[in-house]
Amino acid sequence: MRSSLYRLGIVLLSVAAPIETGCAQTLLHLPPADRVRLAEGRQLATRVCDRIWPGWGQTKFQVLLVGDSAEFLVAPERHPRGFTPLGHDAVLGAEVWTRPRQFSPDLLATFPAVGGVPTVVIGSAERTGKSSTAWVLTLLHEHFHQWQFSQPDYNGGVSRLGLARGDTTGQWMLDYPFPYDSAPVQEAMRSLAAALVQALEAQSETRGRALQAVSESRDRLRKLLTADDHRYFEFQLWQEGGARFIQYAVARAAAATGEPSADFRRLPDYEPYGQAAEDAIRGLRSELEKLDLARQRRVAFYPIGAALALLLDETREDWKQEYTRRPFRLPDLASAGR
């Protein structure tokens, strides 16, 4: 039986843009700015992945860049069907293949798009509305999803959550009927978000109490949810909140490991990684303060999960091992900082 992740990929394929045919429609080279960004992302992954997360650096990094008329497959795991080889790209340090565009050029997702392999499918920085630095950090966010999906029991574990309710496409991951419009759940979510802001800003002498308040808020929310709703909530915190945390961690690690390439720094919208990390944390606090479950739906879970992961990173030495051993739920917070 094919995995839910594979079936979700089929859903995305079914809504992809029509294939454009004809040699004139197909670009035979990567646009220069896209090559520079991809090269920076690949080099950054080599520098920081294993510093940030045990074993992440061993994860395959297959990327499908979606241009306006062509797609470029970078570092495929195996010979891809339906693609034309462009050869080894010395800047990227990888083989590159191309085909006419199939996916929307503003897509940002990771799923088995090519050869059944979890693939980062990503439009250009311009098409996705991101600066070059933000685009690279998003690329690493999606690369962490590749690590998640590569875990030995990912597909089996997702199936055992029992949340599909007859869906065979994987669409339930996006459309699960969580009680977004419940007033008590909305209030509990706002309380949890407020407690997370307080904990992120707490000084050492008040950190223990602030963490306890987060744990109590998390427990109050759990009591309002059915068992299925709670499993879905925790699954989203683990998967999407964890990947959002990775963006902050990558920005911090990148700032500490030297400057990016001169070509990347010359891009007109380049922002230093240290500044990007500071902006991201400020943005996270703003998201938590303005959290609106009824309007944001599933996306409201992302800053909650990211904030919990940041606190775990400060309070539990073993949280990454626990995250891997017991997937689909973020570990509990420690009672005080380490």
Model feature map: region roles:
Residues 124-139:
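Short pre-active-site segment immediately N-terminal to the catalytic Zn-binding motif
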Residues 82, 96-117:
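Catalytic zinc-binding patch centered on the HExxH motif and its immediate surroundings
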Residues 28-50, 94, 281, 292-295, ...:
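Non-catalytic terminal regions of proteins
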Residues 137-149:
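Active-site recognition of the HExxH zinc-binding catalytic motif
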Residues 9-20:
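Bacterial N-terminal signal peptides
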Residues 150-213, 218-222, 229, 233-279:
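Post-HExxH zinc-binding segment in Zn-dependent metallohydrolases
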Residues 25-94, 243:
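N-terminal mature-domain "stem" immediately C-terminal to a signal peptide or N-terminal signal-anchor/transmembrane
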Residues 254-314:
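Extended hydrophobic/aromatic segments used for targeting, binding, or gating
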